[in-house]
Amino acid sequence: MTTNKPSFSYFKVLVLGQLPRFTLNYFGTDFTDNYVESIDDEFRKTLKFGQLPLFVDSDGFRLTQTDAICKYIAAKHDFLGKSIKERAIVDETIAAVHDDVIIPGYKVGKGVEDKKVIDTIISRHFTTFENVLAENKFIAGGDNYTLADLYVFVAYHYYKHLGHSEKFQNKFPHLEALQAHFESNKGIAEYIKNRPDSGRGI
């Protein structure tokens, strides 16, 4: 049976596309990364819910929804935690990062959300992540990194990209160490270096 390289499709903006792209690149996946300008009617008909992102595996398996894609990729690499409790915390972290950090940050960057939201998120979510790392070393506990750590890193990286670096200054040493760990990964370093600029800052 002929197989093709996996492919991932999303726009140039980071937002929800960055999480699967970071995950794929972290594991050194050889995949075709499609930066989509717009979704025409024909393309939309091929999408399960009429929207991106879209991941197509080498065997033709198609998957949409950011978190489902990331968990599918992570599962292939035993990156979802070893115990039921770790996996539950991974799910908890994924939901918090996606719904309470990435989306509001994007909305502020787009100008449709009050900037005061950023201070609340930093004091509530990033402080919580910092405290967890100070106590446990890894977000989900356990003895190794999981998708929860990668999600927290992406959120931290994204907020710096959005221009909030000075709000983090000297406050989150464990998050800084987490960022250094993931950005030392060859695949992630190459992705950050070579990804196109959306021109929109988000």
UniProtKB/Swiss-Prot annotation:
Top-rank taxon: Eukaryota
N-acetylthreonine carried by residues: T2
Reactions catalysed, as given in the entry: RX + glutathione = an S-substituted glutathione + a halide anion + H(+)
Pfam families, sorted: GST_C_3, GST_N
Gene Ontology terms, MF aspect: glutathione transferase activity
Gene Ontology cellular component list: phagocytic vesicle
Listed EC numbers: 2.5.1.18
Domain GST C-terminal: 83-200
Example GO biological process: glutathione metabolic process
Matches recorded under Gene3D superfamilies: 1.20.1050.130
The entry's keywords: Acetylation, Transferase
Binding site for glutathione: Y10, R44, Q51, L52, Q65, T66
Domain GST N-terminal: 4-81
PROSITE patterns in UniProt: GST_CTER (PS50405), GST_NTER (PS50404)
Matches recorded under CDD domains: GST_C_Sigma_like (cd03192)
Enzyme class: transferase
This protein's record includes keyword Signal: no
PANTHER family in the record: GLUTATHIONE S-TRANSFERASE, GLUTATHIONE S-TRANSFERASE ALPHA-1-RELATED
Family: Belongs to the GST superfamily. Alpha family.
Function recorded in the entry: Conjugation of reduced glutathione to a wide number of exogenous and endogenous hydrophobic electrophiles.
Protein name: Putative glutathione S-transferase alpha-1
Species: Dictyostelium discoideum
